[in-house]
Each structure stands twice: as structure tokens, then as C-alpha cells.
């Protein structure tokens, strides 16, 4: 079954059908990883369409400083003005699947424009909606290097 799913996923990407919705049909751990990476890239690129796809409508986004934003507020802040993120690099990613819910933990090194790089510990909750995994909750805490 795993070989078949990997083959189908590979075939779908070859046809240009890749993305979060397609990945959800394969291994859920890899589907969540793909959505997480897509979200990071969308935030850095200020890609509103991709952010809308990867973030759940009822998103609760809690920044390391304690500020909490809705999906609309988070996207508006990412899109406002020049790019905010220079890079986001994640390591130590661990994903646990619980039916249609996934919990992702990791460390992230974040570089904002005109700000020294800092490290956070992240906790993400993803839900599968209509065959597509989406980020529904984000929490981060600053940690030392």
C-alpha cells in the first residue's frame, strides 16, 4: 500500500497536480510536512493565495511574544508592506497523526528583515478538511541557541 501511495503521489506531481490536497491522499505525515513547508514558503514570499490554502479559516496564531491573530489578521500582517521574513528554517520536526488531526513540533530559526535571527520552539495543530490538511493552531516560544 505504501509503495502504491508513493507511486500515485509521484505520478500526481509529474502531472502537475501536486499540493496540499493531493498530498492528503498519500501518507498523512508527509502531507502535513508538505503543508508546513508550503506555509513557511508562502509566508516568506508573501503569497496570499497559498496562505489562504494552507491556513484554516478558524486559525489561532499565537506569536512568541504572546500576540494572537486570526487567519485574516495573520495574512494581513504578512502582506503589509515589504517582506517581513527573510527566512524560516525548521529542524527537529516531529509529526503525530490522530485521525483527521495532526500535531507538529519543531524548532525554527527565523530571520526577519532588519532583525537578528532568533530561535523558537513551535507547536502546530493541523486538521484535514475535505481531503486537505490545514494549520488551525500555531504557538511558538523563544528559546536560546
Predicted regions and their residues:
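N-terminal secretory signal peptides that target proteins for export/translocation
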Residues: 1-2
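Bacterial N-terminal signal peptides
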Residues: 6-19
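A beta-strand edge to alpha-helix "cap/lid" segment located at domain peripheries
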Residues: 24-53, 60-145
